[in-house]
């Protein structure tokens, strides 16, 4: 029977993953809080102490730092000497290590964090196990991101968990531990950047970098322009998160943390034209992110508009020369890699909230058409584009989109019909190919009725209201195609 060690700080999906491993004939070992959760879920799991024959000591500071653990992980199974030594010491082979680390970055992001709290959240045993397993990737599977659980299970079931895939997991581990160590260094060096002021001039502010990863705002390479302001940093982060959702050439414009225009196209120039056309007024003074290299042709378009920040994975030399003619525009070069394990946190009085980022995308095949009329292909494309955008809009949020751009956005309203009114009134076009997208369900049929009055013929929304049928009946009355996704996307 194969053996796996599970010791995770981020408990997302761990119970389901552990259950699946037991069904695949893995014997599970765990520590502390992870073991408690698995015990409560009735998942067969043993304590790591059963491997080490040594108890956890010093409030859990020492639990996996033991030859019985690391010998089982590091043994080269192609070397008889290693296997003989394991046998002599009664050490079992470990086939899988599933570990993510104490939340150091989240802990030190709290401005009131104490030195003792920071120190207690420096993980020692976790990185040691991860690095040992990653070093021995030819024989051991190591998982640091919950997002990889499903792929690992699929490969275990179809016998395709090969060395090449284990090597890809190994790379993720060393990237993760490098970022983790860098965050520790930055914190204790006091690596913070004083900003001119905060959200408003009367507020002082500084920027603490807990990572220097190239796919983050903190790790961005600034090629030109003034120091980023507090508001620039927040808006740039929101813009970057949204543009990363698109595989096709895409452009995103953001003002005050809300997208004002999103466009896609066969080329980046087309995508930006669509984003600009979506709201040519609000883009003034905004942040623009692009997911392809900026060419001279696109740079000319960008140069003609007042923008605070332009983000892209690359700028050609000629494009830079054009854009640098404006001395104040900030140009940021950022890797467009998506970090599937990102978390976000918000400070509140006396503490802070931590949650996974809302990156889940419902597959089209899991969405349900609930009306008598089904969407056309073009309406489906419009819905799916809008559904990528709506999680980035403050709730209550209503988006109107076609298959190439947003055409109207109603953000941050206290009631849904109010958000719909704004989106419909500001729409640059409404026709049979435009879809209305809602981040939450309709509590009654009034939003659908309003959409019908403006000529909307396709709606996508989460569903889940006790009065869903009222909205469905209203859609049927007006010949509107409605799709429900089963997943909402509130943003506060």
Swiss-Prot record:
Q: Which domain of life is it from?
A: Bacteria
User: What does the record give as EC number?
Assistant: 2.1.2.3, 3.5.4.10
- Metabolic or biological pathway, per its Swiss-Prot or TrEMBL entry: Purine metabolism; IMP biosynthesis via de novo pathway; 5-formamido-1-(5-phospho-D-ribosyl)imidazole-4-carboxamide from 5-amino-1-(5-phospho-D-ribosyl)imidazole-4-carboxamide (10-formyl THF route): step 1/1; Purine metabolism; IMP biosynthesis via de novo pathway; IMP from 5-formamido-1-(5-phospho-D-ribosyl)imidazole-4-carboxamide: step 1/1
Per UniProt, the keywords (alphabetical) are:
Hydrolase, Multifunctional enzyme, Purine biosynthesis, Transferase
A single Gene Ontology CC term: cytosol
Q: Which residues form the MGS-like domain?
A: 1-144
Question: Pfam families, alphabetically?
Answer: AICARFT_IMPCHas, MGS
Q: Which reaction does it catalyse?
A: (6R)-10-formyltetrahydrofolate + 5-amino-1-(5-phospho-beta-D-ribosyl)imidazole-4-carboxamide = 5-formamido-1-(5-phospho-D-ribosyl)imidazole-4-carboxamide + (6S)-5,6,7,8-tetrahydrofolate; IMP + H2O = 5-formamido-1-(5-phospho-D-ribosyl)imidazole-4-carboxamide
- One GO BP annotation here? 'de novo' IMP biosynthetic process
One Gene Ontology molecular-function label = IMP cyclohydrolase activity
* Free-text note on domains in this protein's UniProt record: The IMP cyclohydrolase activity resides in the N-terminal region.
Q: Matching HAMAP family, A to Z? A: PurH (MF_00139)
For this chain, the family text in UniProt reads:
Belongs to the PurH family.
Any idea what this protein is called?
Bifunctional purine biosynthesis protein PurH
Q: What gene makes this protein? A: purH
């Amino acid at each position: 029977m194969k053996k796996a060690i599970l010791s995770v700080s981020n408990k997302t999906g761990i119970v389901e993953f552990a259950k699946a491993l037991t069904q695949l004939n893995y014997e599970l070992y765990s520590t502390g809080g992870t073991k408690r959760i698995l015990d409560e879920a009735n998942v067969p799991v043993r304590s790591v102490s059963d491997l080490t024959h040594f108890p956890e000591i010093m409030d859990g500071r020492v639990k996996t730092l033991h030859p019985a653990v690391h010998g089982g992980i590091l043994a080269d199974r192609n070397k008889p000497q290693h296997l003989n030594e394991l046998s002599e010491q009664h050490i079992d082979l470990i086939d899988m290590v599933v570990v993510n680390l104490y939340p150091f970055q989240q802990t030190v992001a709290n401005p009131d964090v104490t030195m003792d709290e920071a120190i207690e959240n420096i993980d020692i045993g976790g990185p040691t196990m991860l690095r040992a397993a990653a070093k021995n990737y030819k024989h051991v599977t190591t998982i640091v991101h919950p997002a990889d659980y499903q792929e690992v299970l699929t490969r275990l079931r179809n016998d395709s968990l090969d060395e090449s895939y284990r090597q890809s997991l190994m790379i993720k581990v060393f990237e993760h531990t490098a970022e983790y160590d860098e965050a520790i260094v930055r914190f204790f060096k006091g690596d913070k950047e004083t900003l001119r002021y905060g959200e408003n001039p009367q507020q002082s502010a500084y920027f603490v970098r807990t990572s220097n990863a190239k796919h983050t705002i903190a790790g961005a390479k600034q090629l030109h322009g003034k120091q980023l302001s507090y508001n620039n940093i927040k808006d740039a982060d929101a813009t970057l998160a949204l543009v990363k959702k698109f595989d096709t050439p895409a452009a995103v414009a953001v003002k005050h943390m809300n997208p004002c225009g999103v466009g896609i196209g066969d080329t980046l120039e087309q995508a930006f034209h669509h984003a600009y056309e979506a709201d040519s007024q609000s883009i003034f003074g905004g942040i623009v992110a692009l997911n392809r290299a900026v060419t001279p042709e696109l740079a000319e378009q960008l140069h003609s508009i007042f923008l605070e920040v332009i983000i892209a994975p690359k700028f050609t030399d000629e494009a830079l020369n054009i854009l640098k003619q404006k001395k104040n525009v900030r140009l940021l070069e950022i890797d467009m890699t998506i970090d599937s394990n990102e978390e976000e946190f918000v400070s509140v009085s006396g503490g802070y909230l931590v949650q996974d980022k809302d990156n889940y995308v419902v597959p089209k095949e899991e969405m349900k058409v609930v009306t008598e009329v089904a969407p056309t292909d073009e309406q489906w494309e419009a819905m799916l584009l809008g559904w990528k955008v709506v999680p980035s809009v403050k709730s209550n949020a209503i988006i109107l989109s076609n298959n190439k751009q947003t055409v109207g956005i109603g953000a941050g309203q206290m009631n849904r019909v109010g958000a719909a009114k704004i989106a419909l009134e500001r729409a640059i076009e409404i026709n049979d190919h435009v879809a209305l997208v809602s981040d939450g369900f309709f509590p009654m049929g009034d939003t659908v009725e309003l959409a019908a009055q403006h000529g909307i013929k396709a709606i996508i929304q989460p569903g889940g209201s006790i009065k869903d049928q009222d909205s469905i009946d209203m859609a049927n009355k007006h010949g509107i195609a409605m799709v429900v996704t089963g997943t909402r996307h509130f943003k506060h």
